[in-house]
Amino acid sequence: MCCLFGFYDYGGTLSAKQKNRIISALAISSEIRGTDATGIAYRTGTKLCIYKRPFPARWMRFRLPAEVKAVMGHTRMTTQGSEMQNCNNHPFYGVADGSAFALAHNGILSNDKLLRLEKKLPASRIETDSFAIVQLLEQAGAIDLDTLRITSELLRGSFTYTVLDDHERLYIVRGNNPFCLYHFPKQKVYLYASTKEILNYALSSIRKSLHGPVEEIAVREGDILCLLPDGWRSRGTFSVRHLYDLRAYDWPLSGVQSTRVQKVSGGSYARELKNLACAFGYTPEDVDTWLGKGLQPEEIEECFYYGEI
């Protein structure tokens, strides 16, 4: 359970002070979904910068340069890879065909190890499942709607992720995890967070910095939305059928093959859910019980998010 957050000041209407206030408010509001680590990515001049630490957002001090337009952020609840190894924290740095990008992911991938084997992804000291997405995009050699579609259709588990490239294009890839995007057309600013509740809570403390009406931009499951430096939006889609498919899952690392999702309790996704359960007041035995009753791992994770089983 993590949180994505950020803004895009495509009109250049915000001062440096306002930008720092906005990103701090968004980050602190996002703590409800993770306090183990906090990080942001942004582009200044010709350089893509990433600032991340194994601290809760309220301990972070952001100093954004005045010329920054897009900021992509993440708060983390650790599920795989210690947050004390800062390389495991989001956003991650990648390079596709010589062009840098940053990526932040909310969710749990169940097939990251399988992808590393099948796609022959290089060994890395980064231990998180999320980094497999970075490596797949590096292997694809470009960041665009097509490579994001192909990559997303390879993923299993739960995900929504954001990518900021070297040209200040901000991509939002919505899988089966929540996402909320607001647009202030008069101010020429976009704001986003993983949930509407988090975004509204942040807005309650920064609304004076934003003028005019607000509109919610729909980002549905299977959408790939690109926010461009001039404020325009381009869209693509990918299939999400595989995220709800009950076909057989292969777990080559554990030697288990099953035609029913609830029988893969020895798989990596179920193990991550068991690790996550305690943070929400449940036990690993509860996860086994729900799997035995036919709940999919994705459904259990979503129940964690919304507090209902």
Regions picked out by a protein language model, each given a short descriptive name:
Residues 1-309:
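Conserved short alpha-helical segments that host acidic/polar catalytic motifs at enzyme active sites
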